[in-house]
Each structure stands twice: as C-alpha cells, then as structure tokens.
Amino acid sequence: MNKLDISTINIEQLTSDHAKKIVDFLALELQKYDQAYYSDNNPLVTDAQYDVLKNLNNKIVAKFPHLALVNDHSKKVGFTPSAQFSKVVHLKPMLSLANGFCVEDISNFITKIQNFLKIDHCPKIVCEYKIDGLSFNARYEYGVLTLASTRGDGQIGENITENLKTIQSFPQTLPITDKVFEVRGEIYITNNDFRVLNIQQQKLGKALFSNPRNAAAGSIRQLDPAITAQRPLKYFVYALGEVTNHHFASTQFELLQKLSQLKFSVNTDYILSDNLHSMIEFYNNVATERNNLAFEIDGVVYKVNDFALQERLGATSTSPRFAIAYKFPALIGRTKITNITLQVGKTGAVTPVALLIPINIAGVTISRATLHNKQEIESKDIRIGDYVFLHRAGDVIPKINGVDLSARDAQSSTRFIFPATCPSCNQNLVVNEGETVARCGNSLACPAQIYERICHFVSKDALNIDGLGRQRIRFLLDNKYIVNIVDIFLLEENNKLLSSNKLEDIAGWGIKSVNKLFKNINQAKNVILDRFIYALAVKHVGKYSAKLLAKEFKTAKNFIDQSLKLANNVTEIYEKLCNIEGLGVKTADQLKQFFMVSANVNLITKLVNILTIQDWQYHGDNLLLSNQTIVFTGTFATVSRSEIKVQAEKLGAKVGTQVSNNTDLLVVGNKAGNKLQKAQQLGIKIINEEEWIKMVNE
C-alpha cells in the first residue's frame, strides 16, 4: 500500500485482512511523522493531519484488537529520545492528553467521569490554555534544580538540564525542603520573538524555523547550551511530576496559585467551571481571542480540579482519564488546485489566484487562494493539478504553504505560464523597479481596473454605499447603466429617463430595492475628506495615509489645489509630504502621478461638484476622545456600525476591533458578544448606545 485515501474508509465494512494492511501502513507513516516532529523538529504534516491518521489507527485497532502491536500508536506517547542526549527515566510517566474535537466529545468526557465516579453532577473542572510548545519536566531536590528533561516517549526523555537553566526566569532554587519536587510545563517562543529569530537566521544564512513550536523545540534541544542561551525561550508550568510532599496542593486551582507564589511562570488565564456550558463558553472565548495572544495555543485543556478524584480516575496507557484537550479546528488543510486565474486590481496589479477543490478550514469553506505573483509560483513550483497545503490564521486570506510533491502526477500537473499582457485589456504588463507584481498601465480604459475602482469607491471604508455590491456593479457596467464613478450619482436621474429596462423592472431588483439604493447613494454624497481621498484609489494611499493627507490639506479645495501644484513639480509641497511620518516618498510620488493624468483631475472636479465633502475636523488633543481607543460590540438601534465609527473618529478616537489592556472604552449595543465579558474582566469602562449618543451630542 503506497497511498491511503482515508475518505473512502468505512471501518464497519473492513475485513481483518484489509484492516491489517491499513494499520501496517499507518504504523510506518506515523513513525515517520513522529521522527520528523519530535526528533528532527521539522514536521512533515500538520497537527490536524496527524490527528486524523492517529484517530483512524485507534478506531481500527479498537475494532480489531488482535492487530495491536508492541509499538502500536494507539498505545504510544511521543517518540524515542535522540541518542545525542543522555536519557532520563521519568519517575512518573509523562502522558499525553486525549483529544476532543467537538462539543459532543467534551460532553462524553464528562459523562465518562460521572459514570466512573458514580456521581450525577459535573465535578469542578479547571479550564486552561493548551500551550503549543515543547513539554518538559524539571526536578528539584531539597529545593535545588538538579535535572530537566523532555517528554520523549512518555517513559524516557532527553536530558536538557543545562539548556533549561539558560532561561533566565526559570527558578534555579525553591524555598522548599522536599526531597523530590517535580514541575511540568511547556517551553515556547512568543510570536514576535519567533519573527525576530527567523530574521536573524536569514541574515546568518541558516535555515528558517517553520513555526514557533519548532523554534522552541530546536532551541531547547541544542547540544551547546550557549546557543540555547541566545534564544528567547519562555515557559509556563501547569502540573506536578513526582513529589514526596503529597499535601503541597489538593486541587489544580490551588496548585496553579502555589506555583505562581514560588515564582514560576504560570498562565493566569484559567477558570474554574462546574458545567458543560461554561466550559464551552471558555473555549469559544479563547478561540475568539486566540490570534491576539502573544504565543501560540492549539486548544484548551479541561482537568478535574480535585486531586483526590484525579487519583481515583487514574489513566489509560497513554492518557489520564481526568483531563482532555479540546483542540481548535485545523488552520491548515490539503486540497487540489483545479486552475489558476488572473485577477486585475484597482491599481492595475495582476495577481494569480489558485482555484481549489473547496475545503473547510477552521469553519470556513475555502475555494480560492492568492498566489501573489509570478515569482511565488515559480519558487514554490506550484502547478495546476497539484495538491497543496493551505494555511489560514484568523480572518487572514488563506495562503498556500507548499506543494505535496509526493502526490504530484507528472502527466496531469500543468505549469502555469504567466502572460505578458493584461487578461482584461491585452495591454503589455510591466514590473516596476523595486516591485515583484506585474501591472497593467492602462488604468483609464482597462475594464477590470474600472470595475475594481468603482467597487473600492463605494466600499465600506470609502463612501459606504449600502446595496451596491460587486454583483450589482458588474450588472450596471455590463448593461451600460454606468461607465464610471460619476455615473453612480447620476443613476437615479438617468433611470427616470429610460423608456424601457428601468432598474425596477429588472429581475432581482424591484421598486423597493431600487428606491433604497437611490436613497443610500444620495446619503453617501455627504462625505468626510479623508474618506473621499481614500475612495480615489490612489496607489499607496490607504485609510491611514488618507487621514494624514486630510489632516495636512484640511479642505477638499486645498487638497486638489496643492496636489495640482505637486503634479506641476512644486518642490516645497513634495518635500513637505515626504517629511510627514506615515506618508513618505512613495505616497508623494503616487499622488503626483495621479494628478498628472488629466482624466483623473476631470473625475475629481466632477465629484467635487456633486458631493458635499466635509472639511477635516481634527483639533489635536482638545477633542473629547483624543488618543483614546474605543471598541464597539453588538448591534445599534439608532446608528449603523459605519456611522458610529465615523462619530468616534471625529472625536479623535482610534477605533479598535478587539478588547485588550489598551482599550479605553467599550460601547455595547444589543446582543453584545465576548468583548463585553473581556472588558468586564479587565475593568474597562463600558457604556451603552444611549450614553454614547449623549456623549456625541454634547
């Protein structure tokens, strides 16, 4: 058996012979992956992919017990320690946790505990983060650190004593006199330190680490402790190993507090629960805030709080019965590229996009992924027909990490030939100096660029015309209702003049929908200066740059007058823009080029005659909410989310998306989410919609 398609396996229909072939195949695959993960610090598959294979192995062995081998992965923890390190026998086995992947799994975990203990209630459960690092055990004898080791295979680990001592915050001595006192935890590297470390590796011409977990593992397992000392390692402790004082703590909650008192680093984001609802609520809250953490986590851990109950529950050969890890959905998946198309952006950038067999990653179905540019395709040797690994973090656009070369079919995979001309208007593509992206320079006549600029102009952060989405814009352009941005504001009047094919008569539109659209267009005619500047889609002018330009020019008239002087090579204006922090040479150059095109100037002149562009209203630190960060949550009855954001910005505030220690104020509407709970925990000031409106009006 060379390959295995697990989607076709029905365990209930397996014969013993077929099951044996699959288990034999899985044994070899899992052993290979264990070697790469635990010993080489260079995983070949994602955690999620590994979990799928291991769970399949466990289920088959459960149905066919005679297939269980001495080294069967249903009874295995970790990987055999490397011969490069001296071996350490764990006085108390370092077991791995059983995994749960859905609410039902966690519910079953509680039910099994109740049945085992013969109780009819949920015992108290401590809910903690599952840190994605390298597990370790540290032994103290009479208060002195004498030995530290990795998990290894759960029975025998690797001696990392001298390496662990290089972590500055790790206690070398403890104010206790116990003969043996072992703590267990996780060694990790923060996301920011990981990025810095990889930059250093690149400068030194060394291999880059694939993720923070591998960086931490590779750093603590250095043969030379001096190298480990140069790495920004951190740790959390969360459990005991072997101890001679069995009365140190009676519960997990008490243990975490006492470990903290001993000056160990303990993650303080844990809660005590006694029901499934609050356990799942903890998981959901953590999942929401996951991408805002300084370090990587891959789930949460639930542990029975009472150590006496933990002792009664005991463990299987691989995992304790009193704990379970509720893993986050996979952020990495594998799927097939069916085609590669080209997408032309509002500034002419031509981006290759991979069309994929749809795959669900972290609850989101993904069918497209950007390939960025020609160099990206060539450097990763990405071809049509390839199976690729996708990565998605939070709401970030999915990225193709690499190709599964073992699955490549040479006969069916096809190299993508990047064209020399624009797929929309056939003009020659150019790659500007200092860039890697190919661009179409036919900005005024390229249909794709016209379409994208209109979409940008009406978008949420620009003029925010509700009801005018991409599909409707495509319809209006294709059917000649509009040909440019100005036509949007003439749409209502022009529609009245039509003798046939009025918008309200078109299927999918309707009189109510059309009237609402016209109302929204008219409301959008009143716009603040920075949003107007942003809406123009000048290259290198984003939302922040637009605010800086609005702050500099104050009025629409001055913005246009000064920009025209800039286009006419007035050095004073150019130098002034170049010296504004956050703008610089690139923005000044692009604004100059934009106003050198007469068609752009004509467009702006027409828009100024149609729109009411409000002057910049920033008044420095005298504004009510100057230098404050405000977050909004829930739905609001009297104002839209976009309008309330504008209100905040007019008062000098910075609008955030997540609640953190840097948040000054949370404004809550109906059906407020997890942000409210987080703000309450952090002691952040909270007001409702009515109080907000009163504040704004004052």
Swiss-Prot record:
NAD(+) binds at D47, A48, Q49, Y50, D51, S96, L97, E128, R151, E186, K303, K327. One of its GO terms (molecular function) is DNA binding. Keywords: DNA damage, DNA repair, DNA replication, Ligase, Magnesium, Manganese, Metal-binding, NAD, Zinc. Pfam families: BRCT, DNA_ligase_aden, DNA_ligase_OB, DNA_ligase_ZBD, HHH_2. InterPro entries: BRCT_dom, BRCT_dom_sf, DisA/LigA_HHH, DNA_ligase, DNA_ligase_AS, DNA_ligase_CS, DNAligase_adenylation, DNAligase_N. Its EC number is 6.5.1.2. DNA ligase that catalyzes the formation of phosphodiester linkages between 5'-phosphoryl and 3'-hydroxyl groups in double-stranded DNA using NAD as a coenzyme and as the energy source for the reaction. It is essential for DNA replication and repair of damaged DNA. This is DNA ligase. GO terms for biological process: DNA repair; DNA replication. It catalyses: NAD(+) + (deoxyribonucleotide)n-3'-hydroxyl + 5'-phospho-(deoxyribonucleotide)m = (deoxyribonucleotide)n+m + AMP + beta-nicotinamide D-nucleotide. The active site is at K130 (n6-amp-lysine intermediate). Its cofactor is Mg(2+); Mn(2+). Gene3D superfamilies: 5' to 3' exonuclease, C-terminal subdomain, 6.20.10.30, BRCT domain, DNA ligase/mRNA capping enzyme, Helix hairpin bin, Nucleic acid-binding proteins. Residues 620-698 form the BRCT domain. It comes from Orientia tsutsugamushi (strain Boryong). Zn(2+) binds at C422, C425, C440, C446. Belongs to the NAD-dependent DNA ligase family. LigA subfamily.
